[in-house]
Amino acid sequence: ANLIESGGKGIVCKNGVFGERMRENVERCGGEAIMVNDKWGCPVDPQKVEMALKEHPDTSIVAFVHAETSTGVESDVQNITKLAHEHGCMVIVDSVTGLVGSELRVDEWEIDAIYSGTQKCLSAPPGLSPISFNERAAQKIKSRTSKVQSWFLDLNLIMGYWAGDNKRSYHHTAPVNCLYGLHEALLMVNEEGLEQSWQ
């Protein structure tokens, strides 16, 4: 909702249910989704992604699922991210199933935007969606030419809620009990060891 504006173009990789949902989200934002399709149960093919990037040099994002919940298959986040960056695109990664369950190095691999859920490998109660945007993605959000279509999902407002560069503002009531659950789950991951949890 934040990294693509009406009239924008994004490459969306589909190898299961949640790749299809990414396509729908791009289109709901008024963008054009260039589809890279792979069979269910197969990872996203980086060669197909590269071909789409070459055929559509005016695209701004590549969106894909790290670990497709509907099949359990994992795609090569590091390689796809590198390809996208080589073509001037940002990546949006759905890691709802992958976070903590398999290797994921958000900063080292320079992932621009990523989201997850607390209810999968984090083993915390449902209700929170951990997200991360790097500085490049945050700057793109701040420099949008149009408002994000959803007030609730507008990260400019949420960054103000976090007191980032703006005066602190009220955006929502945080689900405190879920935050306590997430805190405990993270303590358990730390106790086990992150790399051990990938095994």
Task: For each feature predicted by the language model, list its residue ranges.
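Active-site phosphate-binding strand-loop segment of PLP-dependent enzymes
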Residues: P43-V100, A113, C121
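Short beta-strand segments
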Residues: C13, N37, A63-H66, D94, ...
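Short beta->alpha junction loops
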Residues: V36-C42
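Active-site C-terminal subdomain of aminotransferase-like
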Residues: Q119-W198
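Conserved PLP-anchoring active-site segment centered on the Schiff-base-forming lysine
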Residues: I4-E20
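Conserved active-site segment immediately N-terminal to the catalytic lysine
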Residues: V106-Q119
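Active-site-proximal loop->helix
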Residues: R21-E32
